[in-house]
């Protein structure tokens, strides 16, 4: 049997329920992995092994609490936690202990999850400036961001599942760079109470796992909307659209190759594949999104601006509204986004899922920046469910993920197809 920290959530729950593993065994395996790898990966902003062992012992003494009993969970350090600090990677909140769990954390704790620690985020999850976390596949490269530590901890077997957030591409892009399943659910389908938001109309709780089956388990825990039809069990006959989006010129050769391989594999598996060119109005979406982001982050960071003398210049600029859109421009931006949301729901109804890039390429070298969110941002503000599906690799041997997208509230369908596509992509890439 693999080490406990290498098992999936589904396997761990079965092992704990049958008595084959104790939660303490799982905790000890996690501790050993973190101690062996933390010097290189640095996924955690807060980790207390003694507290983790006490928590594991308490779970072993208790009856099975729920569907995640004993499953190691990483929590992005923008979520409030009652028994760990929540610092947002900012001097403003260093040592802060809210004393209460964010709603998503509370839900996972009630389901029996083993809370390993707080994972590294970029400051306030609102900047492209890199943090201390390194990509576990190559420490010279970024793990992406802002959910840097969550993605890296899952990829490196330090956690089994993890919480992230997404304003632009903060869950999906790290999923691609680290080679794990990553999900941005339908906007607000998981409560956002108790985490620091940047853009209110976009920010979404994100999920990480190493298998699509584990994403489905998390969907159960968070009671995501049920499938409207039968569960997909094959790609044969599936209606798949290939959408390169208006930012396709940014795609690097490895993304071109992955999309080409994926399309060929889907056709060979019997899927009905067609190209999807979005209407012209979507070419104006990025500009509208930038205007909305500028205005909403001004409100988000106003309190820090007024109470924190050493707030980073990037956040000062946002609050001071130095690049502010005029009121009329802002109203037009919201109007365009509303039109695109309704239009996309109608367009996507013709397909089961839409295949699109997760990132512009492999994880870039260096730690100064966390990468480009261009292929993620539109889907985030459209508020639709997205799953990064791992499987392909670029010329440096680094992971290259692709995303599956569907209409709002079709989260479980996307997860089901992600599982089928993930198996196919891994076989196609020889993983």
Role assignments for model-derived ranges:
Residues 1-50, 267-270, 429-431:
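An N-terminal boundary/leader segment
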Residues 19, 30, 70, 110, ...:
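Glycine-rich, small-residue loops and helix-cap segments
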Residues 20-28, 57-60, 253-277, 302-306, ...:
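Acyltransferase
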Residues 52-54, 61-130:
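Acidic/His- and Gly-rich active-site-bordering loop/insert found
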Residues 68-88, 237-239, 291-345, 390-401:
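Short helix-loop capping/hinge segments that flank enzyme active sites or metal/cofactor-binding pockets
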Residues 85-95, 252-253, 363-370:
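Glycine/threonine-rich flexible loop motifs
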Residues 100-219, 382-393, 399-401:
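Short glycine/serine-rich loop segments
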Residues 184-263, 425-431:
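A short helix-breaking turn/cap at a secondary-structure junction
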């Amino acid at each position: 049997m693999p080490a406990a920290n290498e098992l999936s959530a589904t396997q761990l729950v079965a092992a704990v329920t049958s008595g084959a593993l104790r939660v303490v065994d799982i905790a000890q395996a996690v501790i050993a992995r973190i101690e062996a790898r933390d010097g290189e990966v640095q996924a955690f902003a807060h980790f207390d092994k003694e507290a983790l062992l006490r928590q594991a012992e308490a779970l072993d003494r208790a009856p099975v609490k729920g569907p995640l009993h004993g499953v190691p969970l990483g929590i992005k350090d923008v979520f409030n936690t009652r028994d760990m600090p929540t610092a947002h990677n900012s001097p403003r909140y260093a040592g802060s202990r809210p004393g209460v769990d964010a709603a998503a954390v509370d839900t996972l704790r009630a389901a029996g999850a083993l809370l390993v620690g707080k994972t590294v985020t970029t400051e306030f999850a609102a900047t492209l400036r890199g943090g201390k976390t390194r990509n576990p596949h190559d420490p010279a490269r970024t793990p992406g961001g802002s959910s840097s530590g969550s993605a890296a901890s899952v990829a490196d077997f330090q956690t089994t599942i993890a919480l992230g957030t997404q304003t632009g591409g903060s869950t999906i892009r790290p999923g691609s760079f680290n080679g794990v399943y990553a999900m941005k659910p339908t906007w607000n389908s998981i409560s956002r109470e108790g985490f620091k938001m940047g853009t209110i109309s976009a920010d979404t709780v994100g999920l990480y796992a190493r298998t699509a089956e584990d994403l489905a388990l998390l969907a159960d825990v968070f009671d995501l909307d049920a499938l409207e039809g039968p569960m997909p069990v094959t790609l044969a006959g599936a209606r798949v659209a290939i959408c390169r989006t208006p930012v396709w010129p940014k795609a690097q050769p490895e993304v071109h190759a992955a999309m080409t391989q994926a399309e060929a594999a889907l056709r060979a598996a019997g899927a009905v594949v067609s190209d999807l060119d979005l209407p012209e109005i979507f070419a104006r979406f990025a500009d509208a999104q930038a205007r909305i982001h500028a205005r909403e982050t001004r409100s988000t960071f106003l309190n820090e601006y007024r109470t924190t003398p050493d707030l980073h210049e990037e956040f000062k600029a946002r609050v001071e509204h130095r690049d502010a859109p005029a009121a009329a421009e802002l109203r037009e931006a919201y109007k365009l986004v509303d039109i695109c949301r309704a239009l996309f729901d109608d367009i996507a109804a013709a397909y089961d899922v839409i295949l699109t890039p997760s990132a512009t390429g492999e994880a870039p070298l260096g730690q100064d920046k966390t990468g480009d969110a261009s292929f993620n941002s539109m889907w985030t503000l459209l508020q639709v469910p997205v799953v990064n599906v791992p499987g392909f690799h670029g010329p440096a041997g680094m992971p290259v993920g692709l995303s599956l997208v569907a209409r709002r509230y079709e989260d479980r369908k996307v997860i089901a197809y992600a599982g089928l596509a993930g198996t196919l992509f891994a076989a196609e890439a020889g993983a």
